[in-house]
Amino acid sequence: MWRPAGIELPRWDLAVTPTVIISSALATRDFQDVHHDRDAAVRRGSRDIFLNILATTGFVQRYVTDWAGPAAVLRGIEIRLGAPCHPGDTLTFTGYAHGDEVAVAGRTATGEHVSGTVRVTS
């Protein structure tokens, strides 16, 4: 066990802006128009552009590694997406470490955007 069981991670509030959504989509080479073109996203039934799965995964990993420190190694991640995350949302991450696993949830005002488990060792 790399950390004592039963540790609640500090909350992290991420202000989601159009720049966050567009730049993370471009950084992950996701050129789907729903991540950078509001009109295209609306035509497809969304209220606005939205965060892609690779960005969400990266933010989950960042949340855990910011807490665990530079010696931590992520050994696995399993996530499930829920409600979309749009510009203007605050994506609030919470987590709970038990053994070598961290349960993570990311919520917006409209509901749970992501939930999952990250396996960590040091």
Predicted regions and their residues:
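Catalytic strand-loop segment that frames the active site of acyl-thioester-processing enzymes
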Residues: 1-49
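HotDog/MaoC-like acyl-thioester-processing domains
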Residues: 1-12, 85-122
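A sequence-composition feature that detects small, non-aromatic residues
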Residues: 5, 15, 25-27, 40-41, ...
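Hydrophobic beta-strand-centered segment that forms part of the acyl-chain substrate-binding groove
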Residues: 43-51, 55-99
